[in-house]
Structure formats: C-alpha cells, structure tokens
From Swiss-Prot:
Catalyzes the transfer of the p-coumaric and caffeic acids from their CoA esters to the 3-glucosyl moiety of a range of anthocyanidin 3-O-glucosides, 3,5-di-O-glucosides and cyanidin 3-rutinoside. Anthocyanins are ubiquitous colored pigments that are responsible for petal color. Does not act on delphinidin 3,3',7-tri-O-glucoside. Recombinant enzyme can use caffeoyl-CoA but not malonyl-CoA as alternative acyl donor. Pfam families: Transferase. Keywords: Acyltransferase, Transferase. PANTHER family: PTHR31625. One of its GO terms (biological process) is anthocyanin-containing compound biosynthetic process. This is Anthocyanidin 3-O-glucoside 6''-O-acyltransferase. It comes from Perilla frutescens (Beefsteak mint). SUPFAM superfamilies: CoA-dependent acyltransferases. The active site is at H162 (proton acceptor), D389 (proton acceptor). GO terms for molecular function: anthocyanidin 3-O-glucoside 6''-O-acyltransferase activity. Pathway: Pigment biosynthesis; anthocyanin biosynthesis. Its EC number is 2.3.1.215.
Length: 446
C-alpha cells in the first residue's frame, strides 16, 4: 500500500441531507459487501501512475460523488425500533481511497483458467469498521482501491455495502465514474452523464408498514463488519458462452422442449449451469429426494405499478426461486426440465401485478431455501462491467468476488471479447470445480 486517503464531493457541492432505507435496502443490512474488481491492460510507469492516473481518478471520483452522494454517506443504524435507519450526508463526508502497487503476475491474474481467489483479495479494499455510539451505530458503505502493476496495467477494486446499491445502480455509478475520468479534461464532462440518479424513495409505491417489519426483524440480529473470510478452499474459473454456443444450447433445449418458443439466453445458461453444478455434487439417495432451489434476482423497476425510474439509485430487487427434485435435476432430462421450471418461475414472477402483497413472505421463503440445496446467481445477462472505460479501453478482466462467500453461486455478465456472448464465473471447492469443468468440456452433447 502506497497511500490511504479520503475522497469526497467538492466542498459545498452537496447539501447536508438524509436518505431513508426502504425495506428493499434493509434486506441487505446483514449481508457481506459486494466486491468488484476490474483489471485494465495499460502499461505505464510509476511516475505516470502517481502523477497522472491517480489524480485523474481522484478528481473524477470526487465529481461523480456529487451525483452519487449516498456512496459518501454514513449509514445510521439506531438501537431502537422506533427510529429508522438512514443514509446521512454531512459536509466533508468521504470514501476511503487506497493506492497500492503489486509485483503479482498481471497476465496470470487476468486469465480464465482455474485459480485460487485468495490473492485477488489483495486488490479490493475493506470497508472501514463500524463505529459504535450510545444509541446507534454508524458505518461507511463504499471504498476504492487502485493498484498499479508496473509496466502492465491497473486494477480498480471496489467494496460496496449492498444496502446502498443493487447491481443496476452500481453499474450506473461505475459507468458514470469511468466516463467522467475519461473526459475529465473536457469542459463539458457533466454531459457524459446519460441520466442523473434518482434517490426519491417515494417513487416506489408500497405500504410503509413493510419498512417497520423489516427493520424490527433486522434488529434481532447483531450488526457486524462482514468482509468475507479468505476462501482458501476455493477455486475460481471463468466459462465463456459465445453467441454461437448460446444459439446451439438454446436449439438443443428447444428441440426437446418445443413449448419454450421464446427461450432467453439467461434461462438456457441458467438451466445448463444449475444441472451441471448439481451433478458435480456427491449425494446420497436421501438427498436426491430433496428439493433443490435456484435463487435468481429480479429487478422490479420496470415491473411495479407505476414503474420505478430506470435511474432509481438504491435497491429494487425481488427474486425468482425455481425448485426441482434433486434426482430430476441430475437425471438425463435435467437441463430440459430445469429450463421449463426456470422459465415458468421467472414468467410468473415478472407478470405478478400483486408481487408486493407477498413481501412479508420473502424472507422466510429465502431462509427456507438457504437451508436446503441451493444455487444462486449474481449479476445478469444485461450487466456490462467491461464497458466501464476510464480512458484505457475495455477492462481486460472483471471479477465479482462476493460469490466466494456464498455456498454455491455463479456470476453472470456480458462477455468481453464476443458480441452477444456471456461470461459465467464459478467459485467452488476444487473437487467440485474439477467435476463441473469435465461436464462443461463435454458440451451440450455430453
């Protein structure tokens, strides 16, 4: 580490204010931080890094935080159920910004081959510890680390507490910051913001009792700093689905399930991955009779009535929860049955006009699934982190490290090098990764 400093909005650029947490935000109060890592191939010297790149990143982040000020906030966590949690911005609030240098092998880090994720954690920051006061706790929700790989490239690691942002909101921020950085020397850099974020919680129409219910439930559990422990028993591997492979996969599924006329790339890949992962596990016959669950995030912004603005910044996620008997999932028809179940569950969820009427059942339903055999996905087929160009072109590699803290999970985003392709990353114990890699290498004919 070369330096740790603070970066905030410029003085007097943001009014002191508070933003309440909705029940959508409170869902994540006890969840570990989201950890994103972007590697950029940009050979530069230490001098150019310290005299040009770092100042530009700081200046552009400062200007971006004017528009995304909740990232600079403290989250206020009262001790009493009578007071609600909120993001509070006071003049001078800022985020932790770490500058580091590494002699690690850059080319090795950006490869898709299996590797231990442990060393990747050297390049993401930790959120500052929780501050305890007599009647409340305070904690910061965002931190940045920039790492130089001399002569090879730059890494940007980000830790975000999930209460402040879901994946669509994070993508809006990273797109805005990278664009601001790329155009920082232009006088009209503000024009690079496609649309400014909306923080007004009243744009989501729901019974306010949900906030009280979720808050009282959150207070039942101790608030702890939750940086994921180092996943020493894990292997991470990235699997790329090119457009032609996706087309072949969809055709294979549709040939066996003709009713799936409008089969999405997401459903096809999700079914293939879910069946493959489950087959990779050894299980006794009793477990084969149990249900297996697949937890899929669903962005509710366009699906509520009235719709929530696309540029709403915060959390606005529900979920789909397909379930199958494990023995069916690992059987010969596993992928086809999984595609049917996933497609039906997502369709039911996104077309449910009364989805918010079931909010009180969400947490118990998810907790039940987490006690069983479950698989989850972070990201989506629309997520394009590679598009975040700070002036050095597309990222060479992106990693969502948060899945290392999950039992069995995958990340999904647009592929870097293949138009229409998608990239899946898995984090698994080595024996299970070896079994899945064998399944994947067989292809859809295996």
């Amino acid at each position: 580490v070369i330096e740790t400093c603070r970066v905030g909005p410029p003085p007097d650029s943001v009014a002191e204010q508070s933003v309440p947490l909705t029940f959508f935000d409170m869902t994540w109060l006890h969840f570990h931080p989201m950890l994103q890592l972007l590697f950029y191939e940009f050979p530069c010297s230490k001098q150019h890094f310290s005299e040009s790149i770092v100042p530009k990143l700081k200046q552009s982040l400062s200007k971006t935080l004017i528009h995304f000020f909740p990232l600079s906030c403290n989250l206020i966590y009262p001790s009493s159920p009578e007071k609600m949690p909120e993001f509070r911005y006071l003049s001078g609030d800022s985020v932790s910004f770490t500058i580091a240098e590494s002699s690690d092998d850059f080319d090795d880090l950006v490869g898709n081959r299996p590797e231990s994720p442990v060393r990747l954690y050297n390049f993401v920051p930790k959120l500052p510890p929780i501050v305890e006061e007599s009647d409340r706790k305070l904690f910061q929700v965002f931190a940045v680390q920039v790492t130089l790989f001399p002569g090879r490239g730059v890494g940007i690691g980000i830790a975000t507490h999930h209460t402040v942002s879901d994946a669509p909101s994070f993508l809006a921020f990273i797109t805005a910051w990278s664009s601001m950085s790329k155009h920082i020397e232009n006088e009209d850099e503000d024009e690079e913001f496609k649309s400014l974020p909306v923080f007004d919680r009243s744009v989501i129409k729901y019974p306010t009792k949900f906030d009280s219910i979720y808050w009282r439930n959150a207070l039942k559990f101790p608030l702890q700093s939750r940086h994921p422990s180092l996943p020493t028993d894990r292997i991470r591997t990235t699997f790329v689905f090119t457009q032609s492979k996706i087309k072949k996969l969809k055709g294979w599924i549709q040939s066996r399930v003709p009713s799936l006329v409008h089969l999405s790339s997401f459903v096809a890949i999700a079914a293939y991955m879910w069946a493959g992962i489950t087959k990779s596990f050894t299980a006794d016959e009793d477990q084969d009779n149990e249900d297996a669950f697949f937890l899929i995030p669903v962005d509710l912004r366009p699906r509520l009535d009235p719709p929530v603005p696309e540029n709403y910044f915060g959390n606005c996620l529900s979920y789909a929860l397909p379930r199958m008997r494990r023995r069916e999932l690992v059987g010969e028809k596993g992928v086809f049955l999984a595609a049917e179940v996933i497609a039906a569950e997502i369709k039911k969820r996104i077309n449910d006009k009364r989805i918010l009427e079931t909010v009180e059942k969400w947490s118990p339903e998810i907790r039940k699934a987490l006690q069983k055999s479950y698989f989850s996905v972070a990201g989506s087929s629309k997520l394009d982190l590679y598009g975040a160009d700070f002036g050095w072109g597309k990222a060479r590699k992106q990693e969502i490290l948060s899945i290392d803290g999950e039992k069995y999970a995958m990340t999904l985003c647009k592929a870097r090098d293949f138009e229409g392709g998608l990239e899946v990353c898995l984090s698994l114990p080595k024996d299970k990764m070896d079994a899945f890699a064998a399944y994947f290498s067989l292809g859809i004919n295996g």
